[in-house]
């Protein structure tokens, strides 16, 4: 009766031999290097896109807040002017209502300006991060191009090597 440990050991050794042969094949190694280089570049590009997208979202938010602040400022100014006209005309009730409206616009303006200041600070950081991410992406693209050039050289060498090692005629 065969020893199960011996059979397992032989199976393991055969499996390892197969793996070594697969990995020793230059074509497999070249393919693995190609996939790894492309995957790394893809990850860097996706990360850069997220960082740049964040910056763009902050820029849009900042623009919207600036427009809101301008609108609230205009509304507060208009309410004050109308309150002054109402007071000059002797309508104190309407003047008080318009002054309260102006105060409401002013308090909203303060809130929007605070949010705008916070967004500007976030945007400054995001802009620097986007610049760095863009540089990293460009460096990654250059690295990928260089790696692909080296990989193409290896492929041509592997093809040459394969042609040299294969027998040209098989004895019969």
Predicted regions and their residues:
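Acidic, Ala/Val/Gly-enriched low-complexity intrinsically disordered segments
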Residues: 170-172
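Extended alpha-helical coiled-coil "stalk/arm" regions
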Residues: 59-97
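Short, charge-rich amphipathic alpha-helices with coiled-coil/heptad character
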Residues: 19-57, 121-122, 126
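Extended, charged low-complexity scaffolding/tethering segments
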Residues: 1-22, 28
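Amphipathic alpha-helical coiled-coil segments
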Residues: 104-125
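Conserved small/polar residues in nucleotide/adenosyl-binding loops
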Residues: 162-168
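Charged, amphipathic alpha-helical oligomerization/scaffolding segments
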Residues: 11, 36, 43, 71, ...
